[in-house]
Amino acid sequence: MLEFPQSGERFEGVENFREWRRQYPAALKFHNRRITHRDDLVVVENLISYDGQPWTFIVNVMEFRDDRVAHERIYIMDGWEAAEWREPWRSATRADPPFPEP
């Protein structure tokens, strides 16, 4: 099962998932930032570019059952500039490296 909580969509069954991926109308480029794995739960933090456009943040939350993805939720969001008022408490070290070229 694949879900997009932000749009309310759900895709059930491997064939629906495969066909959705096959029919996707844009060229996608991914840049993996981090993978966190605990027991049967994996969280993947990526950047995604659609048709060479600027990067967008994407988080995949996957639950595994018997070495297969049983349930996946995908969250997609734009980044934003840090608020200036937080600067006095912010570390000089970035949380993540700058974006690569899409």
Language model features with spans:
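C-terminal and inter-domain tail/linker signature
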Residues: 1-102
